[in-house]
């Protein structure tokens, strides 16, 4: 049985004033974040994410910038107002086979790194859930010393992502 909101807030406050386990405390603080963030792998040179929250396009662009790279290519796939012969589309709903999305993205990045060894930073982020008209559903970013490798790798990644990732 759930207490009234005011009583729950008071209980939560008291719980924080006594000794609480890290798990108990993190659940109350991180609950909304865990609900919106499904899966992320992020390192110095790879950022893969499946998220129910809006994608951080500008953060991805800034992250991909490297002092040894003269090119950063960022592709954003947005929700448009038509799909095939359907017009008046206002939103899309994405579902994912979550356990397989990030491992598949890792494999695609490995393919790209073999084909274009000069690429440095690679990001592939995709939304789940409702994505409104004009919002980003997917972001791919690649940085490289030269634009030809960055463009080619980014095009390869988005094409393979759309064809093979279980979304």
Located regions from the model:
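Short, intrinsically disordered, low-complexity terminal segments
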Residues: 1-7, 19
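Serine residues within intrinsically disordered or low-complexity segments
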Residues: 19-21, 26-28, 36, 43
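A generic local structural motif
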Residues: 5, 28, 125-127
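N-terminal, polar/charged subdomain of small-to-medium soluble alpha/beta proteins
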Residues: 34-137, 143-145, 149-167
């Amino acid at each position: 049985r759930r207490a009234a909101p005011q009583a729950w807030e008071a209980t939560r406050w008291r719980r924080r004033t006594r000794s609480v386990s890290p798990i108990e405390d993190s659940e109350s603080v991180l609950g909304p974040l865990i609900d919106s963030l499904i899966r992320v792998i992020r390192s110095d040179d790879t950022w893969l994410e499946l998220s129910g929250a809006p994608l951080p396009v500008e953060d991805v662009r800034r992250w991909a910038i490297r002092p040894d790279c003269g090119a950063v290519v960022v592709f954003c796939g947005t929700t448009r107002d038509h799909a095939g012969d359907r017009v008046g589309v206002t939103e899309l709903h994405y579902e994912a086979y979550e356990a397989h999305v990030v491992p598949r993205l890792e494999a695609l990045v490995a393919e790209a790194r073999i084909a274009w060894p000069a690429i440095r930073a690679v990001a592939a982020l995709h939304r789940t859930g409702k994505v409104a008209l004009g919002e980003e559903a997917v972001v791919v970013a690649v940085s490289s010393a030269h634009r030809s490798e960055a463009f080619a790798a980014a095009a390869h990644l988005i094409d393979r992502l759309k064809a093979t990732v279980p979304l």
